[in-house]
Design a protein with these regions (language model features):
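Bacterial N-terminal signal peptides that target proteins for export
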Residues: 1-11
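N-terminal non-cleavable signal-anchor helices
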Residues: 13-14, 78, 254
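N-terminal processing/targeting junctions
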Residues: 13-15, 104, 112, 174, ...
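Residue-level signal for mature regions of secreted extracellular proteins and peptides
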Residues: 15-16, 584
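C-terminal motif of bacterial Sec signal peptides marking the signal peptidase cleavage site
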Residues: 18-21
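Short, surface-exposed linear motifs at loops/turns and structural transition points
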Residues: 23-130
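Carbohydrate-active catalytic/glycan-binding domains of CAZyme proteins
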Residues: 26-27, 129-645
Length: 645
């Protein structure tokens, strides 16, 4: 019997094929004369629209009715749909989650029992662009967790977002993505499972997708070059060097060409080649570091081609001048430490700026075609004439010793101000890390701070750009430096760095090893200095700030460079409606507001405003923040604040 039924079914199918197949718009059994009018669209907003249609001579066999829509013509039920169950004479659906400024094609449909969908004629509509007020009203703050220790491991890397970021470098590529590259450091050394110089990317600087390591193995040239130098120095080769992969910089050179300059440290003692630890100390300094080069035509591929050595650590001492009397001696063998590169193109000339601790920051000219030094390097010892044609010319230093706490230069040019800027990391990275800034009208210097002092002479640069801090209802952040500074091509500038949890945060194992990537907005003062916002960037719609919004309580933090390792806390500053400051450090002062430039002047200090996320609020929400500088009796202070009431 079953076989007979199947045979009969095949015959029916064959007959129907001979008579001609049915289209989606043709009626099936039990539908009668049911038809659909073309849909009408109303109440169109940037994210929604209402679509209605009339069903003529509706059939009782209808099991569902609705609307299908797409950004492509002739949508079907395989595209997006909004529907209801059962029969009726009308269809009315509100489409939500639409994209702004987009054309949508829409058809009404009904589905009768055991029949294909019947479609109406097609209608189209265009959503308008959302107003800033609409965007702000609908804004949802980022939800990712800062304490990522529960998913810090390699297996959970799809959840990282900005977790496990250290020493970031950010470039905006031709495909519209921002690509972030970094040091290998990670909580629990998770990155060891996936190569070196790790990459992630984002379209909005808020949501980041991890792509993986850009280098799977240390290039052979590093060991070869290391032991070549050791042979010239009369030293035995190191067969198994201990490597550290640190602080790359990535720049777009031109369409189809991106360069990464990366740092590889050899963490072995010079004399014996033993790994660097206190037990192995052999009265010598540790080995030299190297800066190498990789290139790619497509950052999205995450495939980079290594181009070899660019430069290495160099010394003004003799090749055998590496003796170190004790671990407490800081008269370093190397003059320039070849890590922490940054790269800038200036009118067709290319420059590499690098350096960490030791004697300061160096600048060397690069061949635009090869990406390697323009002039041939000599031996990296016994150097007496430091120029951009050798291992580099000294352009900035923190003091005059051979072991000074400054590193991580980042050099950019702002055409709006006409200045080049050099950002530097001061102090040790775990806690006291803080950022300073210099500027120059020439990429070759002189680089001066806000006091006009030339950094080549060895200065304590002012002002402080970022510093360990703490708003209420949080543990705050420390180790905020070694930054990337970049713009989006539309005049908006950003600062990115790692930040760490403070030591001994309750409930967090090894809390100071929790490193999170931060991205912050930069504004530029009327005098052409960058101020970095105190709260992280969250793509908050920048609705113009009205004066009335400024009245109330603010958490204010005042920072300076005179408190090594201190995490600055906040105090309340209250602005009254009659333009008086009624609480806080500036109590008794007055305030005014320049709405055109979004600058609050409080007690005579100009504070630059921005809408940002209040990351300490629960749940996170939007607020207004400020940043500025002022000179207080010869001490430059950095003023950060956020509106809380």
């Amino acid at each position: 019997m079953i076989k007979i039924k199947n045979l009969f079914g095949c015959a029916v199918v064959g007959l129907s094929l001979l008579l001609g197949g049915c289209s989606d718009d043709e009626k099936g059994t039990g539908i009668g004369n049911m038809t659909l009018d073309a849909p009408k669209v109303s109440d169109v907003t940037y994210k929604s629209a209402t679509v209605s249609a009339t069903i003529n001579e509706p059939s009782a066999t209808v099991i569902k009715r609705g609307v299908c829509y797409s950004t492509e013509a002739e949508p079907t039920v395989e595209n997006s749909i909004a529907e209801k169950q059962g029969a009726a004479s009308t269809i009315s659906e509100t489409l939500t989650g639409l994209a702004e400024n987009t054309t949508y094609y829409v058809r009404a449909f009904v589905v009768a029992y055991e029949n294909e969908p019947i479609y109406s004629e097609e209608t189209s509509f265009v959503t308008p662009a959302a107003t800033l007020d609409e965007q702000l009203a609908d804004y949802v703050a980022p939800a990712y967790e800062d304490d990522y220790t529960a998913f810090a491991g390699w297996e959970q890397r799809d959840r990282w977002n900005l977790a496990n970021v250290h020493d970031p470098s950010v470039v905006k590529a031709e495909d519209g993505y921002y690509y972030m590259y970094q040091t290998d450091a990670s909580y629990g050394n998770a990155h060891e499972a996936g190569g070196h110089f790790h990459c992630r990317r984002s379209l909005d600087l808020v949501n980041w997708v991890y792509l993986g390591g850009t280098m799977q193995e240390i290039p052979a040239w590093v060991k070869e070059k290391l032991n070549e130098y050791r042979a010239e120095m009369g030293l035995e080769p190191i067969e198994s060097p201990v490597y550290g992969c640190w602080a790359p910089v990535v720049r777009k050179v031109r369409d189809g060409l991106y360069r990464m300059y990366y740092s590889i440290v050899v963490d072995n003692y010079i004399k014996t080649g033993a790994p660097n630890n206190e037990e192995n100390f052999d009265n010598s300094w540790t080995e030299r570091a190297f800066i190498g080069l990789m290139e790619t035509s497509d950052p999205a591929s995450n495939v980079w081609e290594d181009k070899g050595m660019v430069i290495c650590s160099s010394s003004d001492k003799a090749m055998d001048g590496w003796t170190r009397p004790s671990l407490g001696n800081w008269d370093a063998y190397f003059y320039f430490n070849a890590i922490d590169p940054t790269y800038i193109i200036d009118g067709g000339r290319h420059w590499l700026v690098y350096g960490s601790w030791h004697s300061g920051i160096a600048e060397i000219e690069i061949d635009p075609e090869t990406g390697l030094p323009k002039n041939k390097l000599g031996n990296p010892w016994g150097i007496s004439n430091w120029t951009t044609g050798t291992y580099g010319q000294l352009v900035a230093r923190r003091g005059t010793s051979r072991w000074q706490g400054s590193e991580g230069p980042e050099v950019v040019y702002n055409p709006e101000t006409g200045y080049y800027y050099m950002f530097l990391a001061y102090g040790s990275l775990a806690v006291e890390y803080n950022t300073r800034v210099l500027r120059s009208q020439s990429v070759n210097g002189p680089w001066v701070d806000i006091n006009g002092a030339d950094a080549a002479n060895g200065i304590e640069a002012q002002p402080v750009v970022t510093h360990p801090y703490k708003f209420d209802n949080s543990n705050g952040w420390v180790g905020i430096s070694h930054c990337a500074v970049f713009d989006d091509g539309d005049g908006n500038w950003f600062y990115s760095s790692q930040a760490r949890f403070p030591e001994d945060v309750p409930g967090v194992n090894a809390s100071n090893a929790v490193m999170m990537g931060h991205v912050r907005s930069i504004r530029w003062t009327e005098d052409g200095w960058p101020v970095v916002m105190p709260e992280r960037y969250g793509a908050v719609p920048q609705v113009p700030i009205k004066e009335g919004e400024l009245v109330g309580d603010w958490e204010m933090i005042q920072m300076d460079g005179n408190h090594v390792g201190q995490q600055f806390g906040s105090a309340i500053m209250t602005l009254s409606a009659d333009h008086k400051i009624t609480q806080g450090t500036w109590k008794g002062g007055t305030w005014s507001y320049d709405a055109t430039n979004q600058v609050l002047t409080a007690n005579g200090v100009k504070l630059y405003l921005q809408r940002e996320v209040d990351w300490e609020a629960f749940p996170r929400s939007t607020t207004i923040v400020f940043a500025g500088y002022h000179n207080s009796n010869g001490t430059w202070r950095t003023d950060w604040g956020k509106k809380v009431e």
